[in-house]
Amino acid sequence: MQIATSSTSPSIFYTPSISPMEEDMNCQELVVNLYTCQVCALPAHGNHFGAISCRACAAFFRRACTGTKTTYKCKKQNNCDIWENGRYKCKKCRLDRCNEVGMDPGRFQFDRDLISATEKYPNSKNFRRTFGMSRLPETIEHFLGRPHFIIFLERHIYSHSEKNFVDLQHLIAKASKLLELGSEKPLIARNNLEKLALGLNLVRDQPAGSHDVQLVTKLGKDEALTFWETDFLTVAKWLTYFDDFQLLPHNQQILLLKSVWHVWNRLEKLALTATSRRQNVCEQKQLMLTYNSVCNPKTIELDYSWFTKYPKEQLCFFFDEMEDYMLTSALDPLTSLEPTDIELTYMLCQLCFHYAGKRYGGEILEVTEKFQENLADNLHDYYVNELNMPRYCGRLNQMLKINNLIQQDIWEKRAKHELAKVFDIFCIEFSHPEMFEDTG
């Protein structure tokens, strides 16, 4: 919140137009004003380069003006929020804002002694008696010696015994049984890719003629566990239609399933949403969770209480909004691409097996690379012999760009998830935590 003040009232911030001696002479008239940064609206530190700003924006402006890279690009038509979800979103809009509020590169000072980053506020009794006010309080960040986004991470808030335990043994046993039994229906296809594409339509389990879609307004523990079970078993059923996968040792099958199920579902839900929007099954602002359930990421109520003791407002650094988690930025290119069942199946395989190979390396990497090589040959045969499209490089590039968006999002979220584990913000434990690695 920014408090407006009269232009004639003195400020606690030092400005170049007022000398320290003049400030001392007028100390009797000193009025404490609360300021926010004119760039990002966070608490300000002082007058930097001609504008009231925080230290972060001042340092950013100095780097932007003196660094080698001074040209930035905006992805949202130069209309971004400077501070959103615990981070600075757009460098271009932030630099434009710095210039708008009057920051001047001509005020930079070079070749001078460093100034200590420690703030020293007058706290003597004479000072308080003279100015008729109590000592200016230290910030919580300064007092605890922690950045603002982890000041709430005090380990005494809850003990280890208060953590919720989720036993996934029964779910893994069900998936293991499915893999041992093999595919539910025998399918005859020319190659693995075509058979997986046929299996994809079977495991989606959409009743014929059913168009009833339920709007999900709340996503809590019960809903999350239900979706996890459905998604995990769906991927297990789908992999039973992959003949090369069925030849692997059972322990490797389970290992791959536990690592790729959530990656598979991210792309599949995006594809389902793109198809549903084209067919007017859901609205343009809605996201499909399953074939018969949909949510509005702007209005859905997310219940965090079952896996953390901290309020949602304090977790904005660690967790994205629903639409960011679903990576809606990949929806537009996916909608424009309109992949066929064969193409979507290849995208799912490439995304999952590339991720698993990168994650485990070694023998798993060799297995997944062989899978990708064989499936790429099948895709080539599909383009050349069925679609009569020998020049398919452009379309393949579009498919891989969408997969790369998802992979990049996974890598970016990994660092935040590691921080969350270090500071122990979760009050939940899984019997098989490897299943939720990189789930974000």
Curated annotation (Swiss-Prot):
It comes from Caenorhabditis elegans. Residues 34-110 bind DNA. The gene is nhr-130. PROSITE patterns: NR_LBD, NUCLEAR_REC_DBD_2. Residues 184-439 form the NR LBD domain. A zinc finger (NR C4-type) spans 37-57, 74-93. It is found in: Nucleus. Orphan nuclear receptor. This is Nuclear hormone receptor family member nhr-130. One of its GO terms (cellular component) is nucleus. Its main location: nucleus.
